[in-house]
């Protein structure tokens, strides 16, 4: 990756949370705001975002007779992430576009760290290699009780390999997400989604407002280290 470039930098928002907490709905609300403000953006997801990363996603989420070990899951997540960063995230930020990502690296700390029990130091090593110091400007952590999220997932029909995990797994994932938010309060905004939708939307609009008002003008240069 290129290092220490002065670029026309867009804003980077990630949407995190366990299954069934409303990430897609929240992302679409933000898209509406960007459309109204005529701010260019791209939408991506993890795992996924490019043809190779989507193929990795299929491997990660498909049921198989062969059990996937936690280390394999983590390494595949970062392989897909490397593709997504190289071919979607960085090019968009360099063009001055905003990036809206349905999950990013925090998901690996929550799912493979909290859920699978992989030591944090291993995830940090991979993150340092693949990301440099790239982080979202804002992370919206959509949060609801695990029972609420899993009930919503059940209503969708067939579950993928990760959605099929049990209650205790998702409790660990949720606890890890909330711990991450406590560690980085400047970046995270925790949005409780087990309430009236209008209240949820208002919280999200309030969270993104500082980025909208501080959005750089076309041609404005912003230094990003580690890219």
From Swiss-Prot:
GO terms for cellular component: cytoplasm; cytosol. InterPro entries: P-loop_NTPase, Thymidylate_kin-like_dom, Thymidylate_kinase. Disulfide bonds: none annotated. ATP binds at residues 17-24. It catalyses: dTMP + ATP = dTDP + ADP. GO terms for biological process: dTDP biosynthetic process; dTTP biosynthetic process; dUDP biosynthetic process. CDD domains: TMPK (cd01672). It comes from the Bacteria. Gene3D superfamilies: P-loop containing nucleotide triphosphate hydrolases. SUPFAM superfamilies: P-loop containing nucleoside triphosphate hydrolases. The keyword Transferase applies. Keywords: ATP-binding, Kinase, Nucleotide biosynthesis, Nucleotide-binding, Transferase. One of its GO terms (molecular function) is dTMP kinase activity. Phosphorylation of dTMP to form dTDP in both de novo and salvage pathways of dTTP synthesis. This is Thymidylate kinase. The lineage of its organism: Bacteria, Pseudomonadati, Pseudomonadota, Gammaproteobacteria, Legionellales. The gene is tmk.
């Amino acid at each position: 990756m290129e290092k220490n470039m002065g670029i026309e930098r867009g804003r980077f928002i990630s949407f995190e949370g366990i299954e069934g907490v409303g990430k897609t709905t929240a992302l679409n609300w933000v898209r509406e705001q960007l459309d109204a403000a005529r701010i260019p953006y791209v939408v991506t997801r993890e795992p996924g975002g490019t043809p190779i990363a989507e193929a990795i996603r299929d491997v990660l989420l498909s049921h198989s007779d062969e059990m996937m070990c936690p280390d394999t899951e983590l390494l595949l997540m970062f392989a897909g992430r490397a593709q997504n960063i190289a071919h979607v995230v960085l090019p968009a930020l360099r063009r001055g576009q905003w990036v809206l990502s349905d999950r990013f690296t925090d998901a690996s700390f929550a799912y493979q760290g909290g859920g699978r029990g992989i030591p944090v130091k291993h995830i940090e090593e991979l993150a340092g290699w693949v990301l440099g110091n790239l982080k979202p400007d804002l992370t919206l952590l959509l949060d609801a009780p695990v029972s609420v999220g899993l009930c919503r997932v059940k209503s969708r029909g067939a579950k993928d390999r990760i959605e099929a995990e049990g209650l205790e797994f998702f409790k660990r994932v949720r606890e890890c997400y909330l711990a991450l938010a406590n560690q980085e309060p400047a970046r995270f905004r925790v949005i409780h989604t087990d309430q009236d939708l209008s209240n949820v939307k208002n919280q999200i609009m309030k969270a993104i407002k500082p980025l909208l008002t501080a959005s750089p003008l076309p041609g404005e240069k912003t230094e990003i280290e580690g890219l």
